[in-house]
Amino acid sequence: MSHKNLLIIFTRNPVLGKVKTRLAKTVGDKTALDIYHFLLQKTKEVTKKISCDKKVYYSEKIIEDDLWDQSIYQKKEQYGNDLGERMKNAFNDGFKKNYEKIIVIGTDLFDLEPTHINEAFKKLNHNNVVIGPALDGGYYLIGLKKLHPKIFQNKNWGTSSVRKETLKNLEKVDVHLLPMLNDVDVIEDIKNHSAFTKFLKPR
């Protein structure tokens, strides 16, 4: 532990037919996987120079020799029955190691920038929780100074109700909301985005 702050990146192992499945219904499994690799690369570029400890949590198994440089990113496997339990466990692991501020992000966001993550750490100085709201009703970032187990329980993960239910759990604490951004889940999320044009050209 070289920093007091920890950035956790939740990632799915990039396997054909297992990632961006809703997007794949329109563009096919191969293009969906290509887009996911593109998003992984963008997430790495955004996070690699942030001044904090960084840990990648893999959905299935740790890949030693991949794009996440082990001199920058620690590596761990997610564990828990659903996304909420896996996030709760990741936060818990970090707080047990005495990190003061912990942020979790995913790898589904092209529009995420270092400024969003830096602002989240900064806002945790004066807020209990920071949330980056996603257009689909979920969130792309959550930052905590201590564990709030309720926010990870009894949620229909992947649905439009998640953020609303989470904020309801946090009515009695100070929450800062970051700018709203858009996750990449379905074709509508990328069809008018210039960064993805190369994936949508007729082949």
Region spans (language model):
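Short, glycine-/small-residue-rich phosphate/pyrophosphate-handling segment
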Residues: H148-L167
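N-terminal nucleotide-binding beta1-loop-alpha1 segment
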Residues: M1-R22
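Conserved alpha/beta core of the MobA/IspD/sugar-nucleotide pyrophosphorylase nucleotidyltransferase superfamily
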Residues: K164-R203
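Conserved donor-nucleotide/metal-binding helix-loop-beta segment in metal-dependent transferases, i.e.
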Residues: F110-G138
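A short, N-terminal amphipathic alpha-helix
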Residues: D34-C52
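Acidic donor-binding segment of Leloir-type glycosyltransferases
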Residues: S51-Q74
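Short phosphate-binding loop-to-helix
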Residues: W68-K101, T159-S160
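Short aromatic-hydrophobic micro-motifs that form the base-stacking/packing surface
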Residues: I103-I105
